[in-house]
């Protein structure tokens, strides 16, 4: 009896060890290759990719196209799943990865037809950057194909990553636009409902967008909102409650400030920005320094 239990225990231990080894090999194979020399088809000259102690990448190339091709490889090997999520979120294609749970999110974006509109106007969207974008796309697909194992997230989802396209690079930018804007148009819908039930002077105060501190790049600043006087708005005449408890929620907007050089000790201007973007893991920003001749 003891021999039987020992044999069963030994088999279980062996299964656990083999399973752990297979998982380790799969995860290890999906990691980016950070060392050595690699052939990257399409390069006109050799490119150097370096990382500092914090993992920040510096790419040194002989041309912009070569730098973008190398950047595409780096992005694919270290961030492809996140890139895939961004293009799919903009195009309304997340349910192809996650199933029915993502259908509602897809519906909110599909109404804009961003993939169809991007592909129909791709040349105009790329402008003079067509060569650089195509080099980047080739680098992305080469870097993805060069991974020993597809990124681990696809293993969990039992999916295969689809190749990158030039239109996907535009869609990732549109995904950030949707993150910073109101793709569901909820703000305008809410203002429309408010306008139907409040006096014009109160609506003008609520809907006013701007302050005396604004410095727009285009057009003139709108200034501060005008406070209605008693002849325009008498709160005592409003029906129903005049106040409600404010619900807690995400605060939309970013913190920015600029200080002129005339106000600093060494004469240099200061610009700071704290963008209120969604929290992601890994982070949205991927810092890279590109070095190539003008």
What is each residue range found by the language model?
Residues 288-294:
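Catalytic or ion-translocation cores adjacent to nucleophile or general acid/base/metal-coordination motifs
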Residues 285:
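Catalytic core of carbohydrate-active enzymes
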Residues 1-18:
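N-terminal Sec-pathway targeting helices
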Residues 23-270, 275-281, 293:
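Substrate-recognition/specificity elements adjacent to catalytic centers across diverse enzyme folds
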């Amino acid at each position: 009896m003891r021999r039987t239990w020992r044999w069963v225990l030994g088999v279980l231990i062996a299964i656990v060890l083999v399973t752990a080894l297979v998982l380790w090999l799969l995860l290890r194979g999906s990691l980016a290759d950070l060392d050595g020399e690699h052939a990257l088809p399409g390069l006109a000259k050799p490119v150097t990719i370096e990382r500092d102690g914090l993992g920040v990448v510096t790419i040194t190339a002989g041309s912009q196209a070569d730098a973008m091709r190398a950047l595409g490889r780096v992005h694919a090997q270290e961030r492809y799943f996140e890139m895939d999520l961004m293009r799919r979120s903009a195009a309304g294609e997340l349910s192809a990865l996650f199933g029915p749970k993502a259908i509602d999110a897809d519906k909110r974006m599909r109404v804009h037809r961003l993939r169809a509109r991007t592909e129909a106007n791709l040349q105009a969207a790329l402008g003079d950057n067509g060569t650089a974008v195509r080099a980047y796309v080739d680098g992305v697909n080469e870097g993805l194909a060069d991974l020993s194992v597809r990124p681990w997230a696809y293993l969990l989802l039992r999916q295969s990553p689809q190749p990158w396209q030039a239109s996907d690079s535009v869609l990732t930018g549109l995904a950030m636009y949707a993150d910073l804007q109101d793709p569901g148009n909820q703000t305008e819908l809410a203002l429309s409902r408010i306008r139907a039930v409040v006096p014009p002077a109160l609506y003008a105060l609520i809907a006013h967008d701007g302050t005396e501190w604004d410095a727009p790049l285009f057009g003139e600043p709108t200034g501060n909102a005008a406070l209605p006087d008693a002849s325009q708005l008498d709160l005592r005449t409003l029906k129903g409650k005049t106040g409600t408890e404010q619900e807690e929620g995400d605060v939309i907007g970013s913190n920015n400030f600029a200080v002129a050089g005339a106000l600093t000790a060494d004469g240099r201007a200061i610009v700071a920005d704290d963008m209120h973007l969604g929290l992601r893991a890994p982070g949205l920003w991927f810092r890279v320094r590109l070095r190539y001749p003008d």
